[in-house]
Amino acid sequence: MGSLCEELDVPFSRCGSLLVTYDAYSVSRLEKKLKNGIQNGVPGVRLLSGEEAEAMEPMLKPGVVAALYAPSTGTVNPWQLGIAAYENARQNGAEAVLNTEVLGIRQNGQGFVVETGEDAYRCKMVFNCAGLSADKVQALAFPPSVRLELDGAEYLVLDKNAQKPSLVIFHQAESCGKGITAIPCVEGNLLISGVRKMLGIPFGTTAEGLQELHTAAKELLPDAETSKVIRSFGAVRPNPYTESGESVHDFCIENPAPGFYSFIGIKTPGLTCANELGLHLAEKAAAFLRAEKNKEFNPRREGIFEKDNEIICQCEQITRAEIMEAIRRGATTVDGVKRRVGSGMGRCQGSRCTLKIEKLLEEYRDGAL
């Protein structure tokens, strides 16, 4: 991941992680994860005593029984990484058709026809990476062997000046408790999550759930400054199940017909594995199409570093030049700008800069800029 972020000019922090437990009965789970980590080639992974873990991360509540330490764990801004990969793909000749729903997929004698409300696209191969809807997209052409059920979690984002651990902290849930995750983000915020729930309102939060998250965070990290929350949100992940209702504990890569691949249930650690999955898919495509390696391919992309003296986002110190560069690269909404340069992610959550960014977007669309 570090080398990929370097190529795509995306910030990356290799901070390490601790998976901690306060329950002697859960140590066997850590030992199993240690064995799996060693078998999978995770560098430097080892089991620590409670005293070693507390010395490594003083913010932890005293009483740690054991902890699994993984020094290679890192953090990255997920949407910046995704957008950077998209920009690099465009640099190398890829085309994108955005805001277009797939309504049908059918086979023809030479491959497939992907139908949308506006057009039909004839292709030799289809790669279905539709995330939360991947099973539904495959069902347009072939019966999937797995179905997705969504569950969610609530998240707290703490201000950059809040005290934070130096490592990613995972809490190994005990038999009667719930795990929690605390992530020191590469941007400087602390992200806290882990209260799993079945979905009522997609992407929603509840007062009870957020309070539970506040309480759990303080139990794990007593000095966590949860009063400095600047944002809360809900997120979902796709859990794959077989038709008989059995949970699938791995990624599902389906190949129901020559030239058709579906990636279903790509959840944690999906971001970490995304590049390797992409390389795996590229090898399949090259073999199927008998394609030759593109000698002109350029893996490098330059980040947005344009700056001037006009500050638009006061909280994050984002300049007009940065916002205009994000717009020139394809941002068409305030959220699109936000995910490229970080405007609106600070303490005021965009209350002071949103209208200014909307005006710049409008002027750019009208040709005034």
Identify the residue ranges that each predicted region occupies.
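Short Gly/Ser/Thr- and Asp/Glu-enriched loop/turn motifs at secondary-structure junctions
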Residues: 13-17, 151-153, 341
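Dinucleotide-binding Rossmann-like beta1-alpha1 core, especially the glycine-rich loop
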Residues: 1-56, 179-180
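Short loop/edge segments at beta-strand edges and connector loops
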Residues: 14, 49-50, 98-100, 116, ...
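Iron-sulfur (Fe-S) cluster-binding segments and ferredoxin-like electron-carrier domains
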Residues: 203, 319-332, 351-368
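Flavin-dependent oxidoreductases
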Residues: 105-110, 114-208, 215, 224, ...
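Helix-loop-beta segment of a Rossmann-like dinucleotide-binding subdomain
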Residues: 9-21, 54-92, 195-200, 261-266
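C-terminal catalytic lobe of FAD-dependent flavoproteins
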Residues: 186, 202-311, 315-322, 326, ...
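Helical element adjacent to the flavin cofactor pocket in flavoenzyme catalytic cores
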Residues: 68-125
